Structures are given as structure tokens and as C-alpha cells.
Amino acid sequence: MAHQAHAYHMVDPSPWPLTGAIAALLLTSGTAVWFHFHSLTLLTLGNILLLLTMYQWWRDIIREGTFQGHHTPPVQKGLRYGMILFITSEVFFFLGFFWAFYHASLAPTPELGGCWPPTGITTLDPFEVPLLNTAVLLASGVTVTWAHHSIMEGERKQTIQALTLTILLGFYFTFLQGMEYYEAPFTIADGVYGSTFFVATGFHGLHVIIGSTFLAVCLLRQVQYHFTSEHHFGFEAAAWYWHFVDVVWLFLYVSIYWWGS
């Protein structure tokens, strides 16, 4: 490798942007083919290629940052800005769902019976499973902070314990949400109430699964001695993401479950 007189990371040529783009093409065209011709072949191929691309691309980033030392302070600064902008884009993504919900609920049309929840909809009790879910996510926010402080203090064993607990709480939340969907007295086809409820809470549930996976990778890396008290941005990004998921749930709980019922 040629000597460089700057702290920035000159990335080696990589096939992953190309395979990622092909996966995106297969996913979008595969979805259209699935809707119109009921064939899952393209969609399945796209999913497999996307998962392989994600695994290998992130594996390469771990190699570059952890083993080759390319993630210097200026590079880490860029990664931080990237994560902040990504979370900001997610905030606006959820803002769209809240907008749809409040647009429908603050001025219910005559078709809904002029009231909210619409006539004929039996809502979920916000003080049963949704309240338990809130407690579970808030507890996971505490355990992920405990993990962060343990990493910074070099407490390896405590970090592993706290991360394991956070992941278990994340999976417990997903299980409870799945049970709630199964027992719900309305479906996604029940007008604007059903669609806003299931799309908003469903996308949040998807983010919990993504966050749990992100933290599980961090746990694996922590077990393999990848993180030090100074160098652990992978974990920090996962913790930011988890706190974001936490805050979105609080807004969902107050808006859709409590006020909306």
C-alpha cells in the first residue's frame, strides 16, 4: 500500500455497492412480479443477495476499522455524522405515519361516524400489553446505557451481561407485539384505523428487530475483543439507534394506544 500523508480512509475497490444495487433491483421488480403473477422467485433471490451483500460489506468494514486501523478520528467523525443523518431520516419516516394518524383522527370524516376510534372498532386496552411493552423497552434503554458505561470503564463481563439482557428484552418486546397482533380485535383491512395502527406499530416492530440484530452483532464483537474503552463506535451507533426506537415507541404509545383509544 502506498504511503498517504492524511488521516482519511481511501477505500479499496469493492463489489458490494454493485451487488447491493442488483439486490435492490431484484427486490423492487420481484415485489411487482409477486403482486401480479404470484411468483416469489425474484423476491427470494433479491432477499438472499441483499443479506449476503449486507453481511460481507459490514464484515469488510469491521476488518478495515478493527484490524487494519483505518478508522482514524476524522473517519469516525464522518461515521458519526452518517449515523446522525440516518436516524434523522428515520424520524421523518415515522413523522409521515404520525401525520396520517392525526390527519384521520383529529377531524374524523362522516364515513368514520364522525368520531375516533371509528364506529365499530374495538380498541386495545392501553394499560395491558402496550403498557408492559413500554416498561420492557424503557428497561432495555437502561440496560443498553449500562452496557455503554461498562465498555467505557473496561468492564468486559458487565458489558456482555448488559448487552445480553438488552437483546433478550428486545426479543421479548417482539414476542409480546406478535401476540398482541394475533389477539387484536381489528385487522389492517379495517379502514383508516386498522391501516394507521398496523403500519405505524409494524414499522416500529421492524425497527426493534433491526436494532436487536445490530446489538446481537455488537455482543458477538464484544465477545471477540473487538471493542476497547476508546474505540467502540459500532456499539455506540447501535445504542443511539436503540434509544431512537425507544423514543418512537413512547410517541406511538401516547398517540395511538392511549390518546387514540
Swiss-Prot record:
Cellular compartment(s): Mitochondrion inner membrane
Catalytic activity: 4 Fe(II)-[cytochrome c] + O2 + 8 H(+)(in) = 4 Fe(III)-[cytochrome c] + 2 H2O + 4 H(+)(out)
UniProt cross-references to SUPFAM superfamilies, sorted A to Z: Cytochrome c oxidase subunit III-like
GO BP, sorted A to Z: mitochondrial electron transport, cytochrome c to oxygen
Keywords: Membrane, Mitochondrion, Mitochondrion inner membrane, Translocase, Transmembrane, Transmembrane helix
Cellular compartments per GO CC: mitochondrial inner membrane; respiratory chain complex IV
InterPro entries assigned: Cyt_c/ubiquinol_Oxase_su3 (IPR024791), Cyt_c_oxase_su3_dom (IPR033945), Cyt_c_oxidase-like_su3 (IPR000298), Cyt_c_oxidase_su3-like_sf (IPR035973), Cyt_c_oxidase_su3_a-hlx (IPR013833)
Principal subcellular localisation of the protein: mitochondrion
One family name in Pfam for this protein: COX3
Assembly information from the UniProt record: Component of the cytochrome c oxidase (complex IV, CIV), a multisubunit enzyme composed of 14 subunits. The complex is composed of a catalytic core of 3 subunits MT-CO1, MT-CO2 and MT-CO3, encoded in the mitochondrial DNA, and 11 supernumerary subunits COX4I, COX5A, COX5B, COX6A, COX6B, COX6C, COX7A, COX7B, COX7C, COX8 and NDUFA4, which are encoded in the nuclear genome.
Name of the protein this chain belongs to: Cytochrome c oxidase subunit 3
The organism of origin for this protein: Oncorhynchus clarkii (Cutthroat trout)
Gene expressing this chain: mt-co3
